[in-house]
């Protein structure tokens, strides 16, 4: 029977009737109903970044479930991304302390990667897809990565990819990991959308496929409150990764982690050790069946992630927003849409009726004549400054139509999807402006021009 030490401690505390002369200020009462379970680091409650008691026991339960050392984050995968990049920097500085570390990164990274590169003074070499592609996707093959590493003037501290990506494409993690290890570097994976991959009948989790470290947003696909996430470390990673994981998380994390989220992660262990894998397998089959039915109906689907349905909207005669509005009218709320795609995320917490209702709603949308639209494809902007220098420069916000030739200071993209079209330090060209305008970005933050 899987234990839940964090929940058990807090339930006992709630029943004790103790006078709360500690934070938080609500003292366990309030309008929302969950305040009694919201505590701080009192005696016995442990401390997330110095865990030795109930939190450590819960993390050990998670480690057993994932088959590798696992550490909790109450600040999403963003915290775990910064932490694993910091650990890669530590490992690289042991070899070459004199130079800023270099990371090869697939271009469709989350903007947290860019901010981490600025904070950690990382040089980035971007990996692009071999043929065009949407800014949300960047399929890097093992062959292309091997060629890039072979041609590199210096060995990178790590290779960083996003898999699954926002559109549901899963990379060849095993192939990429093999290339990285043969070339003497590490593979880090932003697996924010794929925590559930470990619990499929055959695991597709990055650490099981050879990644040295990855982050999972537990809250995205598991029964966990928003903000709950994991940092996973492979047993084959450099020793500094496990030894320094808590230090890395503490460097970027809040000193007030949410005990509500920690309880949610604790409860998830019991779910994952119980009926979750069977329910996941059943829902994956239902999702695949719906995908086949939609394709037979004429919809164009993309991606191979088992718990995500991504429809290319243009061939049906709509924008992604147009399809999303039809779903909203049917009482269905999708994860994401843009001018080209509609993304829907499914989990075992959905019901069979939910899937049937989604299928009926989509198939009731009449097909229209597809318009001939030339999509602006992301280019390869030229960098004028290092990421850190651009982020730390005086900056101003200007309309995108006036931005050609200026240097981007901030990545200028919301969440979702939080994937930048241009990156800090790059010169904004006409193609970037077309992309900004196409995706509804009306202004951007650029470095200030200094007179004289």
What are these regions (language model features)?
Residues 103, 362, 437-452:
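Surface-exposed interaction regions enriched in Ser/Thr/Asp/Glu
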Residues 35-79:
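Conserved N-terminal alpha-helix of the aminotransferase class I/II PLP-enzyme fold
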Residues 69-70, 99-103, 421:
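Short active-site oxyanion
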Residues 70-71, 124, 334:
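Generic structural signal for residues in well-ordered beta-strands
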Residues 2-11, 50, 75-300:
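Conserved PLP-enzyme active-site core in the AAT-like
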Residues 1-53, 185:
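N-terminal "arm"/small-domain region of PLP-dependent enzymes with the aminotransferase-like
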Residues 292-441:
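Conserved C-terminal alpha-helix-loop-beta "cap" of PLP-dependent enzymes
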């Amino acid at each position: 029977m899987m234990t839940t030490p964090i929940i058990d401690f807090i339930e006992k505390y709630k029943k004790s009737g103790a006078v709360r002369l500690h934070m938080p200020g609500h003292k366990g009462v309030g309008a929302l109903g969950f305040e009694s379970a919201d505590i701080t680091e009192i005696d016995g409650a442990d401390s997330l970044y110095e865990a030795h008691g109930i939190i450590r026991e819960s993390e050990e339960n998670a480690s057993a479930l994932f088959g590798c050392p696992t550490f909790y984050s109450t600040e999403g995968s963003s915290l775990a991304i910064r932490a694993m990049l910091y650990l890669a920097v530590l490992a690289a500085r042991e070899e070459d302390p004199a130079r800023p570390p270099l990371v090869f990164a697939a271009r469709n990274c989350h903007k947290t990667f860019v901010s981490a590169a600025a904070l950690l003074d990382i040089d980035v070499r971007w990996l692009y897809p071999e043929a065009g592609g949407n800014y949300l996707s960047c399929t890097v093959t093992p062959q292309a990565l091997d060629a890039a590493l072979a041609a590199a003037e210096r060995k990178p501290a790590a290779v960083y990819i996003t898999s699954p990506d926002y559109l549901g494409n899963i990379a060849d993690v095993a192939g990429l990991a093999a290339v990285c290890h043969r070339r003497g570097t590490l593979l880090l994976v932003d697996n924010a959308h794929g925590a559930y991959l470990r619990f499929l009948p055959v695991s597709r989790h990055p650490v099981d496929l050879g990644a040295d470290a990855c982050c999972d947003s537990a809250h995205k696909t598991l029964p966990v409150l928003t903000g709950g996430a994991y940092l996973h470390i492979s047993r084959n990673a450099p020793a500094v990764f496990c030894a320094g994981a808590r230090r890395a998380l503490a460097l970027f994390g809040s000193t007030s982690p949410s005990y509500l989220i920690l309880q949610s992660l604790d409860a998830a262990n019991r779910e994952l050790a119980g009926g979750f894998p069977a329910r996941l397998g059943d829902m994956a089959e239902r999702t695949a069946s719906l995908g086949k039915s939609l394709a037979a109906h004429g919809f164009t689907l993309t991606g191979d992630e088992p718990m995500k349905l991504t429809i290319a909207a243009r061939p049906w005669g709509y924008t992604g927003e147009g399809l999303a509005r039809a779903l909203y009218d049917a009482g269905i709320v999708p994860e994401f849409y843009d001018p080209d795609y509609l993304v829907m995320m499914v989990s075992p917490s959905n019901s069979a009726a939910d899937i049937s209702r989604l299928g009926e709603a989509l198939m009731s949308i009449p097909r229209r004549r597809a318009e001939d639209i030339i999509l602006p494809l992301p280019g390869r902007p030229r960098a004028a400054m290092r990421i850190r220098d651009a982020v730390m420069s005086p900056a101003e916000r200007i309309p995108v139509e006036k931005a050609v030739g200026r240097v981007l200071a901030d990545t200028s993209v919301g969440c979702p999807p939080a994937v930048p079209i241009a990156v800090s330090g790059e010169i904004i060209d006409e193609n970037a402006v077309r992309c900004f305008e196409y995706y509804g970005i009306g202004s951007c933050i650029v470095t200030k021009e200094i007179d004289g």
